[in-house]
A protein has these predicted regions:
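Conserved SF2 helicase motif VI
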Residues: 424-440
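Conserved helicase ATPase core of P-loop NTP-dependent helicases/translocases
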Residues: 368-401
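Post-DEXD/H (motif II) to motif III coupling segment of the RecA-like Helicase ATP-binding lobe
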Residues: 212-274
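IQ-motif-like calmodulin-binding regions
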Residues: 496-552
Length: 552
């Protein structure tokens, strides 16, 4: 007798609640991650059928973040029924039930079901290819599904560190003797033995480092020694910041099997959009620079007095915003229990640990600090990560140098603190990705203590692209995420500072001097009138050449 779908899930350790609408499935106690509907259809399901199911399911998702839907259609389905996988609905046939009973099932979210099929299609045409997916969308589960489906063949799995390899092993869920897990660094330590490595499949996680380090050549040797093996690379950030090199083109023959960007993950509600707390940390220096600029400017006395009043008011109005403890007290919810702090290097870490701990303590938080970096060794770092993961009434604060940048999620993380500006957009997204997780079910907090008063945030840059995604067709009931929740003191402060800067802008100052000259002399300055005359002549020339801005 074939077990019921409920029994299949229970055997896998999933939490199941039966209802008229379908089965509510949870991978963790107290959470619902999916609604599964079993359908005994006589004809294959079509796109229209799937859209009707989506409309019904979407009303059930209220109050649940990142909930996905699965239809198990005993009568099969047409390929068009899979059109809504990015929106969170996938369709399966009876082979899905066979997988549940196989003892090697790896459950995938709908967006990863789409990615996995793309991998299978890609390998029908190419021996080597890559998948690019935003951090937190389940790349380790994609690799785990591939491993489980090829468990009888020899597989080599490479990743930057043991912790990432352990995450992949955990996602697989069962032991497979034909699979060999190796770090990139191990290829250097055992280079003489690398020629003995044989595989039918080579899987490379975080492939954007391929070729960037000394081990890149050793990994290339392994690939060349297995000239018939299928090679699959996974990364969230394939563009290397140095030289903006596209590693998909460079190392995977340009064969991009599937891509899911961070923008798509946000828009389609695959990842929760963090609450961005933009701090005014460092505002003192900014206001001091404005003060010096005012003193050096050629403003009229009247304008100087006007701008000085605005500066003085800004100092008074934002006095509370200058202190990091006040920002933390006001904007970091007390429900937050896991905070990641990223440091530039070990020296930076040693300086920031006491400072950040001081801020948190002054903000009224009881904390336990942890440090993870390469100087401690992998075993010690593993023990520290385990301790950080433990549940506690205290705020666990993990200070990291590089190690959590690459492909690793720590369960339960709900906040990230940015302390240093980075020139690498890629690193910024990787840091942001540490608190993004498709299974988290909650909205994380990003404390931005980088002094970015004069620049655009990642949110400012991405918002227009989200608007464009909203123009794509969607099923009834789908609501895409097209906006960000930005809070903190910064937006108001930035507006005030931009107003002051505008008043100190050289063109505006010279224009006012011109008006004053015209009023007093009832004439226009000639080129012999010094700086004002030269400036006025320059504007005339720019106007004649069509280069003067319209508003001027």
């Amino acid at each position: 007798m074939v077990p019921s779908l409920t029994d299949c899930y229970l055997r896998l350790g999933f939490k199941v609640t039966e209802s008229e609408e379908g089965l509510r499935i949870g991978f963790k106690p107290g959470m619902v991650h999916a609604i599964v509907k079993e359908v005994r259809n006589e004809r294959p399901l079509t796109r229209s059928d799937a859209e009707l199911f989506y409309e019904k399911f979407s009303t059930l998702s209220k109050g649940h973040r990142n909930l996905y839907f699965r239809i198990v259609a005993h009568g099969g389905f047409l390929p068009e029924a899979l059109d809504f996988e990015l929106h969170g609905l996938t369709v399966s046939d009876e082979s899905y039930i066979e997988s549940l009973l196989s003892g090697r099932h790896v459950e995938l979210y709908p967006h990863n079901e789409a990615a996995y099929r793309a991998i299978m299609r890609g390998f029908k045409q190419h021996r080597i290819g890559a998948v690019v997916q935003a951090t937190g969308t389940g790349k380790s589960y994609l690799l785990a599904r591939y491993i489980a489906d090829h468990a009888k063949e020899k597989i080599l799995v490479f990743a930057p560190n043991i912790t990432i390899l352990d995450e992949i092993r955990k996602a697989v869920g069962f032991s497979i003797p034909q699979v060999t897990y190796r770090t990139f660094q191990s290829l250097i330590r055992n280079r003489e033995d690398n020629r003995l490595l044989r595989a039918d499949h080579i899987l490379i996680d975080e492939f954007h480092h391929f070729g960037a380090e000394i081990w890149g050549g050793a990994l290339q040797d392994v690939i060349e020694n297995n000239s018939r093996a299928y090679v699959l690379g996974m990364s969230a950030t394939p563009i290397r910041p140095e030289g903006m090199i596209d590693t998909v083109d460079l190392y995977f023959e340009g064969n991009l099997f599937y891509e899911l960007t961070l923008l798509q993950a946000w828009y389609y509600n695959i990842l929760p959009v963090p609450v961005l707390v933009q701090s005014a940390y460092g505002l003192d220096n900014k206001l001091d620079r404005l003060q010096r600029k005012l003193e050096r400017s050629g403003c009229s006395k009247e304008r100087k007095e006007k701008v000085q009043r605005k500066l003085d008011l800004a100092r008074v109005d934002f006095k509370e915003a200058l202190g990091a403890p006040e920002v933390i007290r006001k904007f970091l919810p007390t429900s937050i229990r896991k905070l990641l702090v990223f440091c530039r290097n070990l020296t930076d870490l040693k300086q920031m640990v006491p400072e950040v701990c001081g801020w948190l303590t002054q903000a009224g938080r009881t904390i336990t600090p942890f440090e993870i970096h390469h100087a401690q060794g992998e075993r010690q770092n593993g023990r520290i990560l385990d301790a950080f993961r433990e549940e506690s009434d205290r705020l666990h604060v993990l200070f990291s140098v590089n190690m959590l940048i690459e492909g690793l999620h720590v369960e339960g993380v709900d906040a990230v603190l940015f302390l240093r500006r980075t020139e690498s957009y890629i690193v910024t997204l990787q840091q942001l990705g540490r608190c993004l997780n498709a299974e988290a079910g909650k909205r994380p907090v990003v404390l931005d203590f980088v002094n970015n008063l004069s620049g655009k945030s990642v949110y400012d840059v991405m918002a227009p692209h989200l608007e464009r995604l909203s123009l794509l067709p969607s099923p009834k009931g789908f609501e895409g995420n097209t906006s960000f929740l930005t809070t903190g003191f910064l937006s108001d402060i930035r507006l005030r500072i931009e107003e002051i800067l505008a008043e100190l802008e050289p063109w505006q100052i010279m224009y006012e001097r011109l008006i004053e000259f015209r009023r007093e002399e009832n004439d226009w300055p000639s080129i012999t009138e010094g700086k004002l005359g030269l400036w006025c002549n320059t504007q005339r020339i720019a106007y004649k050449r069509g280069k003067l801005q319209e508003e001027r």
